[in-house]
């Protein structure tokens, strides 16, 4: 927002619903002008973030596409790796790192710049230790998958290739903090350029491993390690070699202080996001226990891949909204945080509607990117309606979660996710899938309408009833608390 509207006193802010008119906009030259200003601010973050998300996710999609043309078993194994082994850990570590959006975003808004570098170093340590604790999921992937009901051939192949993605697992610990560190400083173009370079390298390496050296499924998965670590190398060099002079002041012994308190905050963020992320991973695992599991897993994994690809857009809005809300609250501007929320939700919903229509129109052609099997393509076609509904709901829900991250509500949203997803959605999906014999369509439909839809509705209610002036005050108190804590250490 501009200085005039940003400095306007908020009168009776607590009683004004989120979706009512923005009075400061009229004072600053009209609603349209304020919407345009806020839209530019959001797109400055979201635009490069969308490209970054698409490029990063495309690394896994391209890998899956290569595997799909090797055979149905290979596609199923890669799908399990992406959605279970990597997917579970990705969700937890990304969720824990999202606490940096609250800390760095509000510190940046309050002009406490040096703390961003300290926070990033602390999260490198925290996430690296978490990666060590999560290693058994890779080392014992085969027995774990067999225990939860996956077929022996899929479990054996998945366990073999799981060992080849352990370097990617540890890459998460360094990439996520670097990404949030730069993102909160609005250096999204740097992140996007690095992601684009890494994607281009991955395509070459993947083709070379699979078709040049004929390494098959092992070469396909091994190629994933190269772009992730290249991305980290580029971002690290930029951050530490003059690109962030205000926020990076060198390695600090302060990185080893306050780790326990930050871990507690990270746990709330991790639980909030991973409960949501794991929800759809569990859908994949339950499908593996159905009759004709290979076709069911392949078709659902294709739908989840398309959804995940499109999901990079609302996730960019998740990140952008979190940064905008955190910056405004850190600057003491509750009104600006509220207005940023309105604009961000509206933009994301419009894009979601567009892609929903695209999926409905091209419902019978979606699967051809990943497979040439007629049975798999028909199964994907049958699931396209549910895919469209999922895309539409996900155009709103992540943005609301971004508001939660920017405001520091992670612990509350974690309870909401637990209740909606696992106490309502999951049992509903199981009932529809097995008791009423609707198979994968029943499981997915039950989990969408029983979990995601209810969770989105609750978040809408919470956001519309939010007292934004009070949130700005709490942000100021939180920043002072951490500064005093660091001074004491």
Swiss-Prot record:
One of the GO biological process terms: xenobiotic detoxification by transmembrane export across the plasma membrane
Listed Pfam families: MatE (PF01554)
InterPro entries: MATE_euk (IPR045069), MATE_fam (IPR002528)
GO molecular function: antiporter activity; xenobiotic transmembrane transporter activity
GO cellular component labels: membrane
Transmembrane segments: 42-62, 75-95, 125-145, 157-177, 190-210, 217-237, 271-291, 300-320, 342-362, 385-405, 416-436, 442-462
Membrane topology per record: Multi-pass membrane protein
Localization, UniProt: Membrane
Main localisation: membrane
Keywords: Membrane, Transmembrane, Transmembrane helix, Transport
Family, as annotated: Belongs to the multi antimicrobial extrusion (MATE) (TC 2.A.66.1) family.
Descriptive protein name: Protein DETOXIFICATION 26
Organism encoding this protein: Arabidopsis thaliana (Mouse-ear cress)
């Amino acid at each position: 927002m501009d200085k005039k509207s940003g400095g306007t006193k908020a009168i009776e802010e607590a009683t004004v619903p989120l979706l009512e008119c923005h009075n400061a906009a009229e004072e600053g030259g009209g609603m349209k002008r304020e919407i345009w200003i806020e839209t530019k601010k959001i797109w400055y973050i979201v635009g490069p973030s969308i490209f970054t998300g698409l490029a990063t996710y495309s690394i896994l999609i391209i890998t899956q596409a290569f595997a799909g043309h090797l055979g149905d078993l290979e596609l199923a194994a890669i799908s399990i790796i992406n959605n279970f082994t990597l997917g579970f850990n990705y969700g937890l570590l990304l969720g824990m790192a999202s606490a940096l959006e609250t800390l760095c975003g509000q510190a940046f808004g309050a002009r406490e710049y040096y703390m961003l570098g300290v926070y990033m170093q602390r999260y490198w340590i925290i996430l690296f230790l978490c990666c060590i604790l999560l290693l058994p999921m890779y080392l014992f992937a085969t027995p774990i998958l067999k225990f939860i009901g996956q077929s022996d051939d899929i479990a054996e192949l998945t366990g073999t290739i799981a060992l080849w993605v352990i370097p990617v697992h540890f890459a998460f610990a360094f990439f996520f903090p670097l990404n949030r560190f730069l993102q909160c400083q609005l250096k999204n173009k740097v992140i996007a350029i690095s992601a684009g370079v890494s994607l281009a390298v991955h395509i070459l390496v993947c083709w070379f491993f699979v078709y040049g050296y004929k390494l098959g499924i092992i070469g396909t998965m091994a190629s994933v390690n190269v772009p992730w670590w290249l991305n980290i190398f580029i971002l690290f060099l930029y951050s530490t070699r003059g690109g962030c002079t205000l926020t990076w002041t060198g390695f600090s012994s302060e990185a080893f202080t306050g780790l326990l308190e930050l871990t507690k905050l990270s746990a709330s963020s991790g639980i909030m996001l991973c409960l949501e992320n794991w929800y759809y991973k569990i859908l994949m695992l339950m499908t593996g226990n159905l009759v004709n599991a290979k076709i069911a897993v392949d078709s659902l994994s294709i739908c989840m891949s398309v959804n995940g690809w499109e999901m990079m857009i609302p996730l960019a809005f998740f990140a952008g909204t979190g940064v905008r809300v955190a910056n405004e609250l850190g600057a003491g501007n509750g009104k600006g945080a509220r207005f940023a929320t309105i604009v961000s939700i509206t933009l994301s919903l419009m894009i979601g509607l567009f892609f929903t229509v695209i999926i409905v129109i091209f419902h019978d052609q979606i699967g051809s990117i990943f497979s040439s099997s007629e049975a798999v393509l028909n199964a994907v076609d049958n699931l396209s309606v549910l895919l469209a509904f999922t895309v539409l709901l996900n155009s709103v829900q992540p943005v609301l979660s971004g508001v939660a991250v920017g405001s520091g509500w992670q612990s509350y949203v974690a309870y909401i996710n637990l209740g909606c997803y696992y106490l309502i959605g999951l049992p509903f999906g199981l009932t529809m899938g097995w008791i009423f014999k609707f198979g994968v369509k029943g499981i997915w439909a039950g989990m969408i309408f029983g979990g995601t839809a209810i969770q989105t509705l609750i978040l809408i209610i919470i956001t519309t009833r939010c007292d934004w002036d009070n949130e700005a005050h709490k942000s100021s108190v939180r920043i002072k608390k951490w500064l005093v804590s660091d001074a004491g250490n």
